[in-house]
Design a protein with these regions (language model features):
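Active-site cores that bind ATP or allylic diphosphates and position pyrophosphate for catalysis
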Residues: 17-184, 189-402
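N-terminal catalytic cores of NTP/NDP-binding nucleotidyl/phosphoryl-transfer enzymes
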Residues: 1-2, 8
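A glycine-rich helix N-cap at a beta->alpha junction
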Residues: 8-19
């Protein structure tokens, strides 16, 4: 569904990020840049920025890659004082880059888009890549803004509004899928944000019109995705608890070897865990100043997926992803596909079965690919069970062509 939405939004080609999407921003960026660089035909990388320029990202990236002695000294002092690593890193960077004014670095490094953008630049510098970075600065609402406004609402606000409509209206006024699919709602797939803003401003205060207004703004080809999202047919963190329970019941002796897990965290997990805990209860019990809740979620996901340091960590040092799996493409992208096949220095997979043939020798690549397929199958099985349908094997998944 995401591939369909990306293609309908104007993308020519959609490539899977594979299992590296479950890792931290550093590994996520390293894998993404590794794929793009090895395609052999990518000139530019664009990413979101709240307000910073490419030069700002480059300055931080160089500092964090080189780690001069003064930086390491301040970093250690701040860690010993009780600061978390992100706080200590921002303080040290601010002292070196802005003449002992850490507040500038703290402001920069607290933004999620800046953290990811910084890792993109670090990955480009580490690979000596010829790909040129380009920032797209945010317009409209801030990343964390939770209210719809006239121009460029945040994704957070849109998600919350979707929940609001479903909770208050959808059971009484279900979306008219037939009307939307017939094109009568006027959705052409263009300027969706403007339609949302206009309809929101004109009808939001009229409760009886609200569901119809939201339907008109977001129906058509987007409706199945929205309906599934609102009806909770997608996988949530809580859906993973039975798998964590099972892993713990096995009394796994190597829990400390899962990717992102350390011995201290493993001990806390074993001390806190008890049958009947919710996923959020577990996160709350594991919460510590030294690790973010997002990192905790990733670690627990890696336990569910049985992802250990090897081969994941070892492979990421050099070639983070040994293949690029194409999920979908537009009919007009044939020249791009041809250029990729001519220039790519990694395997190009268009059908999952191709990967099965390529990586059947027990190598690290084979293990990574099997984890990727297993992850997709697990997600599909949970989602299918919640939706009351039969799951589709990842090996039978077809490319999306638009």
């Amino acid at each position: 569904m995401r591939t369909q939405m990306a293609l309908s939004g104007g993308a020519d080609l959609v490539i899977e990020m594979a299992i590296y999407a479950t890792a931290s921003a550093e590994y996520f960026a390293t894998a993404g840049i590794g794929i793009l660089d090895q395609l052999g035909c990518v000139d530019y990388l664009s990413f979101g920025s709240e307000w910073a320029e490419v030069e700002d990202f480059s300055a931080y990236a160089t500092l964090f890659l080189e780690e001069p002695e003064k930086y390491k000294q301040i970093l250690q002092e701040q860690l010993k004082s009780g600061k978390s690593f992100p706080e200590a890193r921002a303080f040290a960077a601010g002292n070196l880059l802005f003449d002992s004014k850490p507040e500038k670095a703290i402001e920069f490094l607290k933004e999620p888009n800046h953290i990811l953008g910084l890792e993109y630049i670090k990955a480009l510098q580490r690979r000596n890549s010829f790909i040129r970075p380009v920032v797209i600065k945010r317009k409209g609402n801030h990343y964390h803004e939770n209210k719809l406004t006239e121009n460029y609402s945040s994704a957070t606000a849109i998600r919350q509004e979707m929940y609001h409509f479903y909770r208050n209206f959808s059971r009484k006024n279900p979306y008219n899928t037939e009307t939307c699919n017939s094109g009568k709602c006027g959705n052409t797939g263009k300027n969706t944000n403007n339609r949302v803003s206009n309809i929101y401003n004109n009808t939001y205060n009229k409760e009886k019109d609200a569901p119809q207004a939201f339907e008109k703004a977001l129906c058509g080809e987007y409706l199945p995705f929205i309906e599934g999202f609102l009806q909770n047919n997608f996988v949530t963190w809580e859906d993973l608890m039975p798998y964590l329970d099972y892993t713990f019941l096995l009394k796994n002796k190597v829990i400390g070897k899962y990717f992102g897990m350390n011995l201290d965290l493993a001990r806390r997990f074993q001390n806190i865990y008890e049958p009947g805990l919710s996923f959020e209860d577990l996160i709350e019990g594991l919460h510590a100043r030294q690790i973010t809740d997002a990192a905790l979620r990733r670690v627990l996901l890696h336990i569910v997926l049985h992802m250990k340091y090897y081969p994941f960590l070892e492979e990421a040092k050099d070639i983070p992803v040994p293949y690029a799996r194409i999920l979908g493409f537009s009919k007009s992208s044939s020249p791009l596909l041809k250029e990729i096949r001519q220039n790519a220095t990694l395997d190009i997979i268009q059908r999952p079965a191709e990967g099965k043939k390529l990586y059947s020798n027990g190598s690290a690549q084979a293990q990574i690919y099997s984890i990727d397929i297993r992850t997709a199958d697990l997600y599909e099985q949970i989602a299918a069970r919640k939706a009351g349908r039969k799951p589709i094997s990842e090996y039978k998944r077809q490319q999306v062509i638009r």
